[in-house]
A protein has these predicted regions:
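ER/Golgi luminal nucleotide-sugar-dependent glycosyltransferases, focusing on the catalytic module
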Residues: 1-174
Length: 174
């Protein structure tokens, strides 16, 4: 896929554009989920991957941005490294916690993995390209055509004017 090759020449991972919260990710998790599950994940990381603990604390206590949906693109080698790290942690967390019989809290492993991706990316100092995720459902389907039209027009305008921007005197002087 040539598009991915070009993309990965500029970054190491592609992630969903982050949501910005008015508080840190620890507070967000505790408001929406079970705090002890997160603290168990932190304990597992402290035991199995202690070098990641400062990054865990930074992501959860000094950060208010989160890329949701567990959607990302990585080169295969990095994906395999991330998966080995993540599932080693999640399987141990699963052994230690009581998974709730609740449609929301029962998805605890998904919620943890969304957040642990940021820990892994930070620890490995990956350069991120953020992309917008387009959600399509019955209510939004009517607006999709308009959105795609504007996206297409903006993309075409960008690429049509690209040669002009490359030759502009301002860019030549830079």
């Amino acid at each position: 896929f040539p598009a991915f090759a070009r993309l990965f020449s500029r970054c190491d991972i592609v992630m969903a554009r982050p949501k910005i919260y008015p508080y840190n990710l620890y507070t967000d998790y505790c408001k929406c989920h079970i705090e002890s599950d997160l603290l168990t994940a932190r304990q597992v990381i402290a035991e199995k991957y202690p070098a990641y603990l400062p990054d865990f604390d930074r992501v959860f206590f000094r950060n208010n941005r989160l890329s949701h949906f567990n959607m990302f693109v990585l080169p295969r080698e990095r994906f395999e490294a991330y998966s080995a790290w993540l599932f080693d942690i999640l399987f141990e967390v699963e052994r230690r916690i009581e998974i709730q019989d609740d449609p929301v809290q029962g998805r605890v492993m998904g919620y943890l993995s969304e957040r642990l991706l940021s820990v892994w990316v930070r620890h490995n100092r990956l350069k991120i390209c953020y992309k917008t995720v387009l959600m399509v459902n019955d209510q939004k389907r009517k607006g999709l055509g308009k959105h795609l039209f504007h996206t297409t027009v903006n993309t075409l305008a960008y690429w049509i004017t690209y040669p002009l921007r490359r030759r502009s005197p301002r860019r030549a002087a830079e």
